[in-house]
């Protein structure tokens, strides 16, 4: 990823960021965007230059104060050291693997989220719902991209299952290896636009990135025939320049996306249950054996499936547990 000649606007600079910079900061600092995050260093680009710098900001203690891919920073013109992270438009984050007290930042300042799933045995409505909850929570427009349509005789079956998750959800089936097929995603990849890419291991994200870029620079791995899955081949979070002038952010495959403080997103994705629950006899109804439960009545009447109900309760319970861990979090 090279961008030494880009202007700030091409990199995604918007009024939201420009208005945060004081006149003194404008004289003393360069605004730069984080294009990639590596261990112990970040790749940043600004107007006319690109370089690696240390990611450490003096005095920053909360994790949200440290830069992640997609962030805009101010760096000192003389020392090129980070001064501060500009206030984000949005931030994707999850529970850190192995430590429920901590959060892991995924990406910042995203315009559109491509939720990638494959048309094979690895397709999971539950996993799509998790990603949709995340998108709704941070207020980013989600597009479900179904890959490997060339490997199935019935891509419309997978598209119908994805579309049924939420009314009006945009679903785009593509053959990730075919530029003509992938071109249907161009509407979200224009100049200065940032698209994030999320999906589990082996769904074809790297192949999709290569086609969108017109390049084979991202390593891909063959899928395992026995179960339709594969290993992810992206090892760093990185932004890739697209032919249409936008930027695509690829992330390592994540099978277990742990939600945190996502009550709003859950309510939006499962708003059908939320609406019916207002008619339960008791305001604190747990939708179990309580008398007068409108949700259970709707399931019995065939308005909802038990499977979707179980997924709703599972995500809500997971979010409650993880949110409580955050509240109890103590500094190391």
What do the PLM-derived regions correspond to, one by one?
Residues 28-38:
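Structural detector for short beta-strands of small beta-barrel domains
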Residues 1-7, 25-28, 62-79, 85-112, ...:
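Helix-rich effector regions associated with P-loop NTPase G domains
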Residues 126-137:
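Histidine-anchored nucleotide/phosphate-binding helix
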Residues 40-44:
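Short aromatic-glycine-enriched beta-strand elements
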Residues 115-118, 145-147:
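Conserved beta-strand segments of the P-loop GTPase G domain that flank and frequently precede/overlap
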Residues 201, 206-207, 211:
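Walker A/P-loop
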Residues 141, 148-203:
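Canonical P-loop GTPase G-domain recognition
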Residues 50-67:
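Beta-strand/loop nucleic-acid-binding surfaces
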């Amino acid at each position: 990823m090279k961008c030494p000649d880009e202007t700030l606007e091409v990199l995604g600079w918007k009024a939201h960021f420009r208005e945060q910079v004081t006149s003194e900061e404008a004289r003393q600092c360069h605004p730069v965007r984080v294009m990639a995050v590596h261990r112990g260093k970040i790749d940043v680009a600004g107007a006319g230059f690109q370089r690696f710098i240390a990611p450490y900001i003096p005095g920053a203690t909360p994790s949200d104060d440290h830069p992640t891919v997609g962030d805009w920073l101010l760096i000192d013109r003389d020392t090129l050291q980070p001064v501060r992270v500009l206030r984000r438009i949005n931030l994707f984050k999850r529970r850190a693997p192995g430590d429920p007290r901590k959060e892991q930042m995924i990406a910042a300042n995203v315009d559109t989220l491509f939720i990638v799933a494959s048309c094979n045995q690895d397709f999971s409505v539950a996993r799509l719902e998790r990603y949709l909850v995340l998108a709704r929570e941070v207020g980013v427009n989600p597009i479900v991209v179904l890959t490997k349509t060339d490997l199935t005789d019935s891509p419309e079956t997978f598209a119908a299952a994805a579309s049924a998750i939420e009314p009006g959800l945009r679903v785009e089936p593509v053959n990730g290896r075919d530029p003509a097929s992938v071109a249907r995603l161009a509407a979200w990849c224009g100049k200065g636009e940032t698209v994030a890419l999320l999906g589990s291991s082996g769904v074809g994200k790297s192949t999709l990135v290569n086609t969108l870029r017109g390049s084979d620079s991202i390593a891909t791995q063959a899928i395992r025939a026995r179960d339709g899955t594969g290993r992810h081949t992206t090892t760093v979070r990185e932004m890739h320049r697209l032919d249409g002038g936008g930027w695509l952010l690829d992330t390592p495959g994540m099978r277990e996306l742990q939600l945190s403080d996502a009550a709003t997103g859950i309510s939006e994705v499962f708003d059908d249950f939320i609406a019916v629950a207002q008619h339960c006899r008791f305001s604190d109804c747990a939708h179990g054996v309580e008398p007068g439960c409108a949700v259970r009545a709707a399931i019995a009447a065939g308005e909802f499936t038990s499977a979707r109900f179980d997924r709703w309760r599972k995500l809500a319970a997971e979010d409650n547990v993880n949110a409580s861990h955050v509240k109890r979090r103590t500094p190391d």
